[in-house]
A protein has these predicted regions:
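Short helix-loop capping/hinge motifs at secondary-structure junctions, enriched
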Residues: 317-322, 351-352, 398
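Short beta-strand "wing" residues that participate in macromolecule-binding interfaces
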Residues: 51-53, 162, 415
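Hydrophobic residues in well-ordered beta-strands that form the structural core
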Residues: 193, 214, 269, 342, ...
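Conserved core of the PLP fold type I
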Residues: 121-124, 128-263, 275-289, 293-295, ...
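Helix-loop "lid/cap" segments that line or gate small-molecule binding pockets
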Residues: 150, 312, 340-348
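N-terminal basic, amphipathic alpha-helical segments
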Residues: 1-123, 324, 328-335, 343-346, ...
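Active-site PLP attachment segment
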Residues: 55, 288-322, 334-337
Length: 452
């Protein structure tokens, strides 16, 4: 009875000020005893939905919380300055259904090494109850054996200079960026990013209140001469610049290290998609050139699967000591089971075998895309095609980016525009992700684009 009457009040069927019928009449209408009705009305009166006005009877009233209405938007919340800045960053995905979806950020389920990962999880789950003190479940840096496995892998495969004491496991690159931004940035400080760049990095840095300065990228990567001298952090994707795909050469890498040392700054090197490099051998990481000034960030979400949420950062010991002290304020420690499974697939060689297969698949799909673009859209210029899961395509003169994206959508094809990734504007360009699409879907999508 109380639920029915309460719903009638909150739903507007019984507006404020409505006088209820007498108890006997209302009980009859509701099909309940008078005693049951009296108990229900007493409860609603205590909740503030009803008010007894002496001989005038019982009147409906709306509690203040109900009268104010529900919170419907972020502006209704007492947000902090950090949250307000965070909400203003990033890029919204327009969503929608398409015949062929070339947008970036798509999972590639057929490349997921399900059997190897499941077996590793099962083995490590069986060991959890037998862990020794060496495992240190509560270590904010993560299990030591995983940090050992990662160190060995990064030194051998990426030319890094890492010891286990320099590694912290993370939930991915974004969580590492957030942790570092909170430690190093605040209002009045300056960070620098490539332009264009990964919007999640720009948003994480800007959320601290620091000024984020975009630095132009050309065919050789970020241009060191444009760097602000007072920056505390520089976010960089030197091995495969996101989104252009260009590689930062050795001379510019040396210039950036010298800049960081002069200004007591740190370079945040995002080793984006390096494991999926499928043309030649990628350059070693910058961290190997300057372990004292480069903080290496990495994630296995692209090369394994997003659901694993396995990432890492490699930092100089003084930085890592600060991170170890501050991490418990947010999530205390990384997930142990996923961390141990990662060590398992690295040490067993399963990850290396998986990468060899994945690179072959990606190389073939990219070849199909490049051939289809060359034949069907010869005016679309591809650059930075050596690595990654997408290609960056410069549009022909006279074709605006928004115009190309809209025309493609009318033909049932989704593209990722580049404009939202840049703070300063730039040439009209789009991104075409290929990793998640079988070859025939790629060809079909380009045919549709050519007819748009």
């Amino acid at each position: 009875v109380a639920r029915t009457l309460r719903g009638a009040v909150t739903g507007g069927l019984l507006p404020e000020g409505t006088r209820l019928p007498g108890h006997r009449r209302l009980a009859g209408a509701l099909g309940v005893s008078r005693n049951t009705l009296v108990d229900a009305l007493a409860g609603l009166e205590a909740e503030g939905y009803l008010r007894v006005q002496g001989r005038s009877g019982t009147v409906v009233c709306v509690p203040a919380a109900e009268a104010a209405g529900p919170l419907t938007a972020a502006q209704d919340l007492p947000l902090s300055a950090w949250a307000s800045r965070a909400l203003s960053g990033g890029v919204d995905d327009a969503g929608g259904e398409y015949a062929v979806d070339f947008r970036v950020g798509q999972p590639v389920p057929e490349l997921y090494p399900e059997a190897a990962w499941t077996a590793a999880l099962a083995r490590q789950a069986g060991r959890l109850g037998r862990r020794t003190e060496e495992g240190k479940f509560s270590d904010p840096l993560g299990p030591l054996e995983t940090r050992r496995a990662l160190s060995a892998y990064l030194n051998a495969a990426r030319g890094a200079r890492v010891t286990p004491e320099m590694v912290m496991l993370t939930g991915g690159t974004q969580s590492a960026l957030d942790a570092l931004a909170r430690v190093f940035l605040e209002p009045g400080r300056v960070a620098a990013v490539e332009d264009p760049t990964y919007p999640g990095a720009r948003a994480a840095l800007a959320a601290t209140g620091a000024a984020v300065v975009p630095v132009a990228v050309d065919a050789g990567g970020l241009q060191p001469t444009h760097l602000p001298p007072q920056a505390t952090l520089l976010y960089l994707t030197p091995g495969c610049q996101y989104p252009t795909g260009v590689t930062l050469g050795a001379a510019r890498r040396a210039e950036l290290v010298a800049w960081a040392r002069r200004g007591n700054a740190f370079i945040l090197e995002d080793d984006y998609a390096a494991d999926l490099h499928h043309t030649g051998r990628p350059l070693p990481v910058m961290q190997g050139l300057a372990p004292d000034r480069v903080i290496l960030l990495g994630s296995f979400s692209k090369s394994l699967a997003p659901a694993t949420r396995s990432g890492f950062l490699v930092a100089p010991p003084p930085v890592l000591r600060v991170l170890a002290r501050t991490r418990p304020l947010t999530d205390r420690a990384p997930g142990t089971l996923d961390a141990l499974a990662l060590a398992d697939v690295l040490d067993s060689g399963a990850y290396g075998r998986h990468l060899r297969r994945a690179r072959q698949v990606l190389a073939h799909r990219q070849e199909v895309l490049l051939a289809a673009l060359s034949e069907g859209l010869p005016g679309w210029a591809v650059q930075g095609a050596a690595s990654g899961l997408h290609v960056y395509v410069r549009l022909p003169a006279g074709l605006e980016e928004a115009q190309a994206v809209a025309a493609a959508a009318r033909r049932g094809v989704a593209l990722s525009p580049v404009a939202p990734l840049s703070a300063t504007g730039g040439p009209a360009a789009v991104l075409l992700a290929f990793a998640h699409l079988p070859p025939e879907a790629i060809r079909h999508g380009v045919r549709r684009l050519a007819s748009s």
